[in-house]
């Protein structure tokens, strides 16, 4: 093409320079000035990597002064172009703009503009973009979004609760599962769903101080959620950046004590516009009508300001009715305002729970029971259902299930309370206790005697705690150089036990970090036993490494030595051997120790080894835990109650273990108390609430669906393709692990979700669960989600040129592969993507205007194509520009009809689903006062907004690939 001064061109290789102007021409060279950057470039007149910029009618162009022109006509004179059209700011028609006046900062965002401007991308990027569109659209439509990406086993009751609650607007619920059933995971899944769906963006978690790091680790390791931990120093730091420090982060964890101590902090927290509040250990918030505790008032104030609230607490039976009422009052103060009224209401629900037990028992119902069911359900036309339920026909079971569902909807607190018990959940292992009685060394006997004399002024509690750990008493007197491990028979026993069980992973827990460190040294030096140490002095990364070393099957540690605090929140269900080198002071800590292995998903019996020294406080405590509470071999929901009531007697026996008088009677009394309380708990079981919380078949179905999706080969191939194109280094390791590290040639210098020092990932859920250092990659993992956003929000792969070698077609045959996107714009919380995600519509146009996409599938077509270099591509495009314009016009008419059908289908689906949801809630409100008015109002408003936004839906061209037939 001949050059003329003033013409506008763009560089094919340096598009960031913007629009260039021809400023000098000689026989062989042409000079372009790029005003946007002030740089000059010299090019050969023939075959140089630059493309002439020419716009067409219908395009919108920008003047260098900033105003825009909608092009209606294009004229050319002496090689220079003038555009004529309507000025958009003044609506003046017939306005001319010479090409020399075009804005030099011009960027081409439309795929066809980029194609004609020579900004042509690689063929593999086009394919990646189409796949990204296709997979993203499929993922948006799945209703269990937020549940699949968790790094946890697929436990039906957890999935059911998370799905039920996570789908609600501003959920306000009480999670009261028994210990070991995974309340933290349930809360994390609810948070994850609320964040992914856009229902929540700002999350506040308030926990006891000792659990802050556990929550921080759990949220990051299991859900890839990066929370910020606010303590005094972080608060002071943030105060420099903002008048309200809590507005500097979207997701915050802080301790209850941190908030309670300072009135200003509480006010700032309440004003920080959170969407969801999560409170752990909520049963410690003391309340009475006359004098609620300061802690309770703090959470009450936050709950008044924050729309969504999750309270994690002990089971209602453990709490007692008044304490249980106090938690419900935090969730819905209007509904639960009077304790007496609450008690009366609860008593009315007893017959409902009994009726469910009856229906589930499968026994024939008496006339009295049938009348009771009729009264409880109080619906018209209930008679045929009752008759079917009581018949011997095959319809009987279905009728009973329907009646149970109707009762469940009417159950007082079932919508805001979820409680699972171990009795109602299958999958827990047996626990077997092995007591190893060992002689008390003379060194310890002497140290204990001296300690008794010197510590006479200590409190009874302090002496009791001292007596549990004789090695510490000995070390206190002998100083730093005391080598208690040389004579302590527990050490010798541990060495022999580990040698005898070389093939078993063994978890050893002791009270103090110092003990764990000393034991590691002994195991290493005396028997070369590989051990990892886990204590509170380690950073999170060091703990992860220690846990991964223990988990590794190849060259991993045989033993993990844990301190009490260091083991909080970590689970090692791949091991089944637990050694308690000493014993904790209260039953909650004992259950926490066993809970490291006794989790759902543990598939072997747990062997609990307790080596203890005779005639010591350890011997007393072993007996009390085992004979008094049965706390080793079964979970002990009564433990805390009995511990509190018998505390004084217990610490007396621990402080003076040589005086055993009355111990047998004390243990016997505790056992009777335990059995009595246990019976009360069992009788008080609310079968209806358990069914509602457990989810039954629904939970099982969710687990199976997600397990099937775990094996998605599309994810693996897409992810590896994405990593290649983005420029992330991949190194295969054994055990289905891949190490990802940033490279120097990435599409973006800092890929979101990929740490600077890289990370280890796996696509295998089981592998991720057994390897603490491996991240579980799913469609919901930040690396994949950010990768999809990176590709789709930019121009990557939006235009390409390929060659098709096919002798059945004439040389030079032109095909245009077009990818349109049908989409609607709306606030994220409306979740429009459930009904109309950005949906790709692929077309393969020939020059006659025929769409061949239905006959030619994308992947098989893509495999037949060959790449073309950018320079040749640009020349090809220039040669066929008119034909491409014609093809685009023909495609526009065809895509309009397809888009209309998609939008209409989305509107029908949205209307049907949201109307049904609304009708169900309104019907329930008539029989169950726990349906909040604001929930119904929000749903009604959202339905209206969703339909309005779907009416505004449109479509656009997202990517274009020109395919030219060749025979070579």
From Swiss-Prot:
Which keywords does UniProt give here?
Activator, ATP-binding, DNA-binding, Helicase, Hydrolase, Nucleotide-binding, Transcription, Transcription regulation
Q: According to the UniProt entry, where does the motif DEAH box sit in this chain?
A: 280-283
EC number(s) per UniProt? Answer: 3.6.4.-
Share what the entry says about its subunit structure, partners included: Interacts with the RNAP. Has a higher affinity for the core RNAP than for the holoenzyme. Its ATPase activity is stimulated by binding to RNAP.
Q: Which HAMAP family match?
A: Helicase_RapA
What PANTHER family would the database entry show? Answer: DNA ANNEALING HELICASE AND ENDONUCLEASE ZRANB3 FAMILY MEMBER (PTHR45766), SWI_SNF-RELATED MATRIX-ASSOCIATED ACTIN-DEPENDENT REGULATOR OF CHROMATIN SUBFAMILY A-LIKE PROTEIN 1 (PTHR45766:SF6)
What's this protein's name? RNA polymerase-associated protein RapA
């Amino acid at each position: 093409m001949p050059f003329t001064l003033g013409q506008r061109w763009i560089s094919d290789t340096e598009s960031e320079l913007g629009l260039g102007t021809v400023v000098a021409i000689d026989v062989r060279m042409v000079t372009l000035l790029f005003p946007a950057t002030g740089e000059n470039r010299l090019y050969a007149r023939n075959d140089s990597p630059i493309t002439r910029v020419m716009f067409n009618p219908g395009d919108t162009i920008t003047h260098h002064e900033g105003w825009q022109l909608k092009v209606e006509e294009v004229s050319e004179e002496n090689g220079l172009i003038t555009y004529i059209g309507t000025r958009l700011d003044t609506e003046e028609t017939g306005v001319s703009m010479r090409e020399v006046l075009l804005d030099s900062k011009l960027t081409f965002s439309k795929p066809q503009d980029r194609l004609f401007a020579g900004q042509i991308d690689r063929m593999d990027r086009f394919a990646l973009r189409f796949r990204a569109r296709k997979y993203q659209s499929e993922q948006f439509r799945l209703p269990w979004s937020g549940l699949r990406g968790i790094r946890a086993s697929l436990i039906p009751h957890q999935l059911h609760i998370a799905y039920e609650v996570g789908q609600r607007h501003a959920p306000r619920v009480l999670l009261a599962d028994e210990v070991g059933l995974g309340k933290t995971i349930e809360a994390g899944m609810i948070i994850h769903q609320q964040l992914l769906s856009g229902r929540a963006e700002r999350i506040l978690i308030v926990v006891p101080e000792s659990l802050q790091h556990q929550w921080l680790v759990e949220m990051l390791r299991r859900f890839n959620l990066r929370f910020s931990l606010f303590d005094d120093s972080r608060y002071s730091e943030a105060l420099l950046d903002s008048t309200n420090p809590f507005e500097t982060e979207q997701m915050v964890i802080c301790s209850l004590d941190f908030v309670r101590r300072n009135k200003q902090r509480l006010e700032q927290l309440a004003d920080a516009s959170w969407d969801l509040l999560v409170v752990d250990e909520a049963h410690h918030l003391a309340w009475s009508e006359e004098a609620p505790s300061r802690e309770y008032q703090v959470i009450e104030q936050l709950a008044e300001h924050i729309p969504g609230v999750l309270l994690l607490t002990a089971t209602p039976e453990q709490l007692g009715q008044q304490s249980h009422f106090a938690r419900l009052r935090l969730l819905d103060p209007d509904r639960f305002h009077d304790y007496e009224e609450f008690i009366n209401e609860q008593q009315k629900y007893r017959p409902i729970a009994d009726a469910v037990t009856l229906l589930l028992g499968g026994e024939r119902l008496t006339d009295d029971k049938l009348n009771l069911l009729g009264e409880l359900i109080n619906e018209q036309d209930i008679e045929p259902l009752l008759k079917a339920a009581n018949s011997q026909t095959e319809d009987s079971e279905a009728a009973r299930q329907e009646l149970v569902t109707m009762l469940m909807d009417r159950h007082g607190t079932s919508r805001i309370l979820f409680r699972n018990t171990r009795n109602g959940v299958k999958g827990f292992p047996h626990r077997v206790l092995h007591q190893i009685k060992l002689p008390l060394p003379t060194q310890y006997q002497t140290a204990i005697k001296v300690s008794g004399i010197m510590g006479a002024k200590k409190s009874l509690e302090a002496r009791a705690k001292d007596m549990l750990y004789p090695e510490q008493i000995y070390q206190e007197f002998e100083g730093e150089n005391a080598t208690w491990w040389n004579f302590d028979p527990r050490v010798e026993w541990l060495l022999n036990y580990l040698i005898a069980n070389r093939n078993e992973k063994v978890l050893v827990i002791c009270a103090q970090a110092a003990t764990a460190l000393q034991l590691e040294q002994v195991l290493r030096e005396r028997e070369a036993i590989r051990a990892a140490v886990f204590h509170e002095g380690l950073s999170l990364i060091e703990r992860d490494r220690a846990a991964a070393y223990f988990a590794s099957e190849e060259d991993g540690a045989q033993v993990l030595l844990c301190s009490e605090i260091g083991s909080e929140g970590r689970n090692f269900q791949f091991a089944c051997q637990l050694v308690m080198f000493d014993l904790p002071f209260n039953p909650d800590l004992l259950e926490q120790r066993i809970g490291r292995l006794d989790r759902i998903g543990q598939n072997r019996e747990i062997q609990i080894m307790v080596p203890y020294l005779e005639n010591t406080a350890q011997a007393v405590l072993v007996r009390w835990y085992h004979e008094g509470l049965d706390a080793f071999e079964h979970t002990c929901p009564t433990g805390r109650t009995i511990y509190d009531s018998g505390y004084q007697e217990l610490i007396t026996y621990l402080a003076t273990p040589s005086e055993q008088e009355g111990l047998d009677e004390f243990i016997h009394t505790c056992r009777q108390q335990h059995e009595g309380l246990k019976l009360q708990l069992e009788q008080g079981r609310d079968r209806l609430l358990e069914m509602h919380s457990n989810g039954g078949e629904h939970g099982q179905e969710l687990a199976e669906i997600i397990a099937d999706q775990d094996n998605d080969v599309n994810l693996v191939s897409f992810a590896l393709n994405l990593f290649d194109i983005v420029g992330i280094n991949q190194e295969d390791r054994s055990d289905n692990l891949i190490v990802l590290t940033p490279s120097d040639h990435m599409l973006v210098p800092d890929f979101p979700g990929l740490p600077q020092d890289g990370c280890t990932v796996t696509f295998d859920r089981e592998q991720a669960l057994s390897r603490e250092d491996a991240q579980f990659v799913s469609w919901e993992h930040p690396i994949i989600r950010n990768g999809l956003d990176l590709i789709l929000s930019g121009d990557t792969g939006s235009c390409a040129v390929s060659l098709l070698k096919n002798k059945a077609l004439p040389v030079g045959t032109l095909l245009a592969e077009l990818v349109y996107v049908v989409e609607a714009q709306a606030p994220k919380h409306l979740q429009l993507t459930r009904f109309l995600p950005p949906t790709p519509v692929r077309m393969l146009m020939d020059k006659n205007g025929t769409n061949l996409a239905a006959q030619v599938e994308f992947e098989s077509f893509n495999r037949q194509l060959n790449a073309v270099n950018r320079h040749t591509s640009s020349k090809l495009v220039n040669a066929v520009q008119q034909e491409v314009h014609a093809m685009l016009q023909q495609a526009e008419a065809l895509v309009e009809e397809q888009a209309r059908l998609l939008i209409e289908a989305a509107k029908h689906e949205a209307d049907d689903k949201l109307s049904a949801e609304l009708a169900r809630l309104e019907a329930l409100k008539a029989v169950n006062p726990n349906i909040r008015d604001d929930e119904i109002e929000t749903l009604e408003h959202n339905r209206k907004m969703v339909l309005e936004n779907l009416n505004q839906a449109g479509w656009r061209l997202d990517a274009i690939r020109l395919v030219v037939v060749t025979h070579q």
